[in-house]
Amino acid sequence: MLISHSDLNQQLKSAGIGFNATELHGFLSGLLCGGLKDQSWLPLLYQFSNDNHAYPTGLVQPVTELYEQISQTLSDVEGFTFELGLTEDENVFTQADSLSDWANQFLLGIGLAQPELAKEKGEIGEAVDDLQDICQLGYDEDDNEEELAEALEEIIEYVRTIAMLFYSHFNEGEIESKPVLH
């Protein structure tokens, strides 16, 4: 069974890891959406989240399971089951911060997997620009929480779509296609 967001957060914090669960999910998602297919994801994770030090043994398994679960949901393009690993907190301001954290680490991950990402044009280039804007998502504590929640829901769906766009673009031939029934 996949570890819960809060349990993963606690384990990362206890181990002194520089990422929270949301950032970890964003980073791993970025690597996968960027087309990384080998085992280099683990050394990259250690490098960018733990000063090149391996994670404690007890943390490697849940992180690997998370990586595999993200990979599986991304490959199911038709099912669109991929979800952003955002905080479970119901507070809309906390969720907005979580989305910004996820997007920041997603861009880092995809940038590592696709070093020429900044040169992409068209849909991909626009999506990169949009994600950079989302990373700087701002709000005022006086903002109407209901309106912010609605806007945030739309942005989250858009980011899910962007992730799937990147995955489809950089992982051609890897996408699971279901047979067409006649």
From Swiss-Prot:
One Pfam family it belongs to: UPF0149
Disulfide bonds: none
One GO cellular component term: cytosol
Source organism superkingdom: Bacteria
InterPro entries: YgfB-like, YgfB-like_sf
Database matches in SUPFAM superfamilies: YgfB-like
Coiled-coil stretches noted in the UniProt entry, renumbered to this chain: none
Database matches in PANTHER family: UPF0149 PROTEIN YGFB
Homology family: Belongs to the UPF0149 family.
Protein name, entry field: UPF0149 protein HI_0817
